[in-house]
Amino acid sequence: MKKYFKFILAAVLVVVLVVVMVLIKNGNIVNFDNRAYNVVTSNTNTFLDNMYKVFTFLGSTLFIVGACIFILVFMKNKKMAGVIVGSVAISTVANNVIKLIFRRERPVVRRLVEEHSFSFPSGHTMAAVTLYGILIFFVMKSRLNKKARITISVVLGLFPICVAVSRIYLGAHFASDVTGAAITSTALLLVETYFIEKYYDKIEKSK
């Protein structure tokens, strides 16, 4: 049972994702989306506008691609770098496929950034959860002391949260878009890290 725990949890998340999709299609998640938007935008000003634009940049294509190139070029362990970039690539493909299948339009609210693709699931959130999530995985597996591992992981874990909230605040996504994105990326990460752990010794020793 323990051996397949990640697969079981990933399967549960897929079921939850399907439920979210059904609720969206049936229009039964409107209240959740509206309440979340009202909470996030209960206080708006120029400072917050700019702050959330910075947060959203941390999940943007430009930043994520730049980070992946940096990792590939400067990370000594090329297999580990390849795994990180590969995880992001898988997430990107999954996001685009789901967007094309689901075809949800963007929210009609005060929008501070312009987006032209479909809304569900949030690409910024999926990319952020995947990149920072896989980095957390490797940090926790590293030889750093426990305090350093936890501190770095907590800081990295804040980034996808900030990205997700920023997408709602900026009017780019419904709350259910970022929720679906987080669920999808987490399910993918669970499956990916299962296989990474099986071959971790080979990956960790590779240069």
Identify what each model region corresponds to.
Residues 16-20, 90-97, 158-167:
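Aromatic-anchored segments of alpha-helical transmembrane domains
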Residues 30-31, 73-145:
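Membrane-interface loops
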Residues 1-61, 100-102, 106-112:
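N-terminal transmembrane-helix/juxtamembrane module of multi-pass inner/ER membrane proteins
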Residues 5-10, 52, 79-87, 148-155, ...:
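Alpha-helical transmembrane segments of integral membrane proteins
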Residues 111-207:
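Membrane-embedded catalytic cores of phosphoryl/pyrophosphoryl-handling enzymes
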Residues 45-50, 94-105, 163-169, 191-196:
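Juxtamembrane membrane-interface segments at transmembrane alpha-helix termini
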Residues 24-26, 75-76, 102-103, 170-171, ...:
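Short helix-capping/hinge motifs at transmembrane helix termini and TM-loop junctions
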